[in-house]
Structures are given as structure tokens and as C-alpha cells.
């Protein structure tokens, strides 16, 4: 189920279980995971499967492997706060994901996270090709970190 309120999302989470975060892109999907205490977000991997069915299967595998209790998906919003064409694609994906798993899903504004992730990796001297291969997982961890920080203030 897609939850639009962070307090409601938090209320539905199991104690001592991690969250998974998704940075959903048209070519690749970044995945991040929190620790069980939900105070640290870490990049996990990139999914490059072509079909939604394969993407969802990969996600379900990670959710089961890490025993995640909730999902955070980055929602592309333009700089004026409006949803974009990509927002509709992400929302549709989230709706499809709800058919395969019964976990709360929270959509988090992801403005500028991929750019911030790329700049973060660049600051460590990582070459462009490697940055482009990893920036979506780092962006997913930044999206998740935003939610974790907000949850820990509740």
C-alpha cells in the first residue's frame, strides 16, 4: 500500500527491521538499505533488468534477503514542486509493486539527489564511468537518509 503521510508510514513499520529505498530510473534502478535501527542508509546495488516483472522479482529478492519492513521510493518532482512525466511512471511502478508485496511504500521527493550523488562520488575522485554506474544507488541512499532523518524526529 502506498502511504502519503510519513507518520502513518512509520506507524506501519515493524521494529528492528530495515527499510529499502529505490531510485527508479528509465535505464537503471538504484537500491539502498538501512540498518535495523534505521539510522544509517547504505547504497546496495543497481538493477538493470529490462522488464518490470524482472525488476520486481529482483526487488522482492532483496526485500526477503534483508527482511525489509517498508519501501521508500524517490518521487521526481520539478524545482517548482510539480510532478513530472517521470513522476507518473514512478507512481505507476509503485502501484504495480503493491500488487506483489504487502509492505508500506512511501514516496519521497527526490529533487537533485542523482546530481548530489554524482557530485559526492566526484569529490572522492571517482571517474565519470564509475560514477554513472553507481550514482543511482548512492541517490537511493540519500533518499532513504532523508526519510530516516525525518522518522527519527517523530
From Swiss-Prot:
It is an enzyme of class 3 (hydrolase). It is found in: Cytoplasm. One of its GO terms (biological process) is rRNA 5'-end processing. Signal peptide: none annotated. It comes from the Bacteria. Could be a nuclease involved in processing of the 5'-end of pre-16S rRNA. This is Putative pre-16S rRNA nuclease.
